[in-house]
Amino acid sequence: MPLPPQLLPYATKLGFPESETLGKIFAILFKDPDSIAIAGVLPGTVKEISARSGIAEERVREVAKRLARRGIISRILHKEDAYRLFPAMIELRDATVITPDYPQELFDMWEILIRKEMPKIVPLLKSLDLPPMLRVIPIEETVESATQVLDVDSARKIIKGASLITAIPCPCRTQANRVGRAKDCPAPKDVNLCLQVNGFAEAVIDRGVGE
């Protein structure tokens, strides 16, 4: 499915400007013309979005709230009525898969995008020498080299220093469950295991997911 022209810059930013798979994902997430038009002019306040898109402020507010609640866009915290797109593909994936009522097709398309299409762009991302989107931190395990994980990155220090902690359904396990890859997963079922801290935790509370 072709990408809507308004969302092509976003698809390019995510690294998939020619992906029909991402086009299908966008078709599920942005289901109406107003959603596409609003997403195409983010970031901004409701007033700014209205001016850029030509959509009435009340309609912008209504659509933006719905998109944020469903994990499609993110509200800019500490700035009234302001929204943004997720800057990385994995953030968009994580935010949407923990929304309970998306169709199975969405999970199937995420599986194709991440497992079949993403590996093709990894060499390009490495050549650009961009900072990593995430890091895997050993939990209370000995790290051979002090340069591998900074002390400020240790899990214990992150949790102790957090001003706010929330727990949400694990996006990775949720995705795996929906596509049949989690048969041997030892994690307990129906337990919120993914911890969010500080700003990410605020976003969880603002959206109303997790605990």
Enumerate the language-model features and the residues they cover.
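Long, low-complexity, charged/polar intrinsically disordered regions in eukaryotic proteins
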Residues: 1-24
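Short secondary-structure capping/turn segments at boundaries of alpha-helices and beta-strands
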Residues: 22-27, 71
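Short helix-coil-helix linker/hinge
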Residues: 28-35
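Short acidic, hydrophobic short linear motifs in intrinsically disordered regions
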Residues: 36-54
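Short amphipathic alpha-helical interaction segments
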Residues: 53-69
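A short, conserved structural fragment
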Residues: 68-79
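Short, amphipathic alpha-helical interaction segments positioned at domain boundaries
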Residues: 79-118
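Catalytic cores of enzyme domains
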Residues: 118-211
